Amino acid sequence: RPLRVWQNPKITDDIYLHFSEILRGVKGYANKIHGTVLDIGAGKMPYRKFFKYDKYISLENHKYPGIDITADVTKKIPLKNESIDSIVCFQVLEHINEPQNAINEMHRVLKKNGVCLLTTHMAAPLHGLPHDYYRFTPFAFKHLFRKFKSVEIKTQGGAVLSIMQLIVWGISEKLPKIISSPLIVILNIIGKKLDKIIYSPVFTINYSVFAIK
């Protein structure tokens, strides 16, 4: 996805409901991100501009333009123990085949009272194949982050918004653009408004996790 969709999703986008919720969550925690920041699975670093920091280190598991570190986070992050103030990891955990190993490495490199902001799917179509391994529940996060002293888990969109997003994806994939485009706008508007009126956390498309070491 282009940077614009991450940073400024529009009502005409077939990913609007999903990405607008991620963006809202990121902005809500932006003031907690500080000091030396490690962005895991950084890609184009779409949310970097929302943070205030002293140093920003980007990490990917493959060579990518502008990336500082290439490493497998399930084995070892090539940084010293307790050297990082903040870790961010957006829409990546579902693509990591050993998520507990990755979370343990995040915990190792974080300073005491360091923070980790992570987002990932609860429900989404298969993507990034063949490396699409998991979908997560709050209980999975509590287990994965059990070494951290504090873990805050939030839904990113309620049941109505999430179901509407899945419908939008189906329409976008199957119908001609001349038909799908106006339908997507209508469904995006309905999904956003209805979710505020009859919000239910029992099903969500995405979660954010904010953990403190």
PLM feature segments, named:
Residues R1-E82, S86-F90, I103, P201-Y207:
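Conserved N-terminal segment of class I S-adenosyl-L-methionine
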Residues R4, T12, N97-N101, E105, ...:
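S-adenosyl-L-methionine-dependent methyltransferase catalytic module, highlighting the catalytic core
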Residues E60, I212-K213:
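Residue-level signal for short segments within beta-strands and strand-turn junctions
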Residues V88, I96-N97:
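Short, solvent-exposed loop/edge-beta patches enriched in aromatic
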Residues F90-L93, T119:
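Residues lining the SAM
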